[in-house]
């Protein structure tokens, strides 16, 4: 287990050196400006939202995607909820209604409910303790809280990126999967893409190979676009080319994000991750999962985690055009699970965790 402390000066330094070129979420006091990810990569369009209903719609229609990005967006949505509140009592009522509206926009998004609960509880505490004596004061203090949600996420990603750089050498090529970048987290940095972005900002030349990631094509639509915006060399490959690029030694390491990591080190991530891990293990290529500690599930066993399945038409068609018989049976799991034997290390904001994961993860979390 490797837990070097990140000197604060180094963290502050990297904040000055790296400035994201792609900002998916922009807050401007009375409005929230969102990059419409459903239109990428062919159209870069920002939309302004000023009402809770508009924020909910942006989440529901995938203008905003990725659990951390949804949480950040919801936090600012709660601030917008009291723009027109006429009293503190009405503000709490408006926030309660806003939480319900936002939570229903993506019922399975844990970060969404976490953010709206945090904002509502903060508002109640401020009013009950007399720290907000007017709606104006309450709005200002809630805006500070929403900014904290953003800043905490960004700082965690910076730390993940700095720890990840320890696994990168000048001239390396990293293989990734799906989109675990700043578009998914809302900060412009990301988790699995953070080491490549920070390395290049520090003058360490790193390139990335991105599989297309069927059926939603997050690799070709989002990861490639995001890295090109940051001027980081990236090569797009078909999902079926993953084995060959590793066999030909075109890859020095594999870095992926994670939707859930169990206490024993099982990693749940976008479908296709397991394949990369097995091939990397066979060929002696290190495989790293990069994720914040909020991703850890210290309770569930691998058999208890349900893997989501999506519409068969996502596989049968591309953008409404069928590429197979409409009647064919389809199995379309969104995620797969990588056993811990294939995971070289898990990189978090607290440090790098090596096997045995069940022991070292609990040590890190103090459990």
Swiss-Prot record:
Its EC number is 5.3.1.23. Belongs to the eIF-2B alpha/beta/delta subunits family. MtnA subfamily. Keywords: Amino-acid biosynthesis, Isomerase, Methionine biosynthesis. GO terms for biological process: L-methionine salvage from methylthioadenosine. It holds the Pfam family IF-2B. It catalyses: 5-(methylsulfanyl)-alpha-D-ribose 1-phosphate = 5-(methylsulfanyl)-D-ribulose 1-phosphate. Catalyzes the interconversion of methylthioribose-1-phosphate (MTR-1-P) into methylthioribulose-1-phosphate (MTRu-1-P). One of its GO terms (molecular function) is S-methyl-5-thioribose-1-phosphate isomerase activity. The record marks 178 as: Transition state stabilizer. The active site is at residue 259. This is Putative methylthioribose-1-phosphate isomerase. InterPro entries: IF-2B-related, IF-M1Pi, IF_2B-like_C, Initiation_fac_2B_a/b/d, M1Pi_N, NagB/RpiA_transferase-like. The keyword NAD does not apply. Substrate binds at residues 65-67, 106, 218, 269-270. HAMAP family: Salvage_MtnA. It comes from the Archaea.
């Amino acid at each position: 287990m490797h837990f070097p402390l990140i000197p604060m000066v180094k963290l502050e330094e990297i904040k000055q050196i790296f400035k994201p070129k792609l900002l998916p979420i922009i807050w401007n006091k009375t409005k929230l400006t969102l990059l419409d990810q459903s239109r990428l990569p062919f159209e870069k369009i920002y939309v302004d939202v000023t009402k809770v209903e508009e924020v909910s719609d942006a989440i529901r229609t995938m203008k905003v995607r990725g659990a951390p990005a949804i949480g950040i967006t919801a936090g600012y949505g709660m601030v917008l909820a009291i723009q027109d509140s006429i009293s503190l009592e009405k503000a709490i009522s408006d926030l309660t209604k806003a939480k319900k509206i936002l939570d229903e926009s993506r019922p399975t998004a844990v970060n969404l409910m976490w953010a709206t609960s945090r904002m509502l509880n903060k508002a109640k505490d401020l009013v009950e303790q007399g720290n907000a004596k007017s709606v104006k004061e309450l709005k200002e203090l809630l805006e500070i809280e929403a900014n904290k949600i953003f800043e905490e996420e960004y700082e965690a990603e910076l730390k993940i990126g700095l720890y990840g750089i320890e696994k990168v050498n000048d001239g390396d090529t990293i293989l990734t999967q799906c989109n675990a970048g700043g578009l998914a987290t809302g900060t412009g940095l990301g988790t699995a893409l953070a080491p490549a972005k920070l390395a290049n900002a520090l003058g360490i030349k790193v390139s990335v190979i991105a599989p297309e990631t069927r059926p939603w094509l997050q690799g070709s639509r989002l990861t490639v676009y995001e890295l090109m915006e940051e001027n980081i060399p990236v090569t797009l490959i078909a999902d079926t080319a993953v084995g060959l690029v590793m066999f030909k030694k075109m890859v020095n390491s594999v870095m992926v994000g994670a939707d859930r990591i169990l206490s024993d080190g099982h990693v749940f991530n976008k479908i296709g991750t397991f394949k990369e891990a097995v091939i990397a293990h066979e060929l002696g290529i290190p495989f790293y999962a990069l994720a914040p500690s909020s991703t850890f599930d210290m309770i569930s066993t691998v058999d208890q985690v349900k893997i989501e399945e999506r519409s068969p038409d996502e596989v049968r068609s591309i953008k409404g055009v069928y590429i197979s018989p409409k009647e064919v049976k389809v199995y379309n799991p969104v995620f797969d699970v990588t056993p811990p034997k294939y995971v070289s290390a898990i990189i978090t904001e607290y440090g790098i965790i090596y096997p045995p994961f069940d022991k070292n993860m609990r040590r890190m979390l103090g459990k």
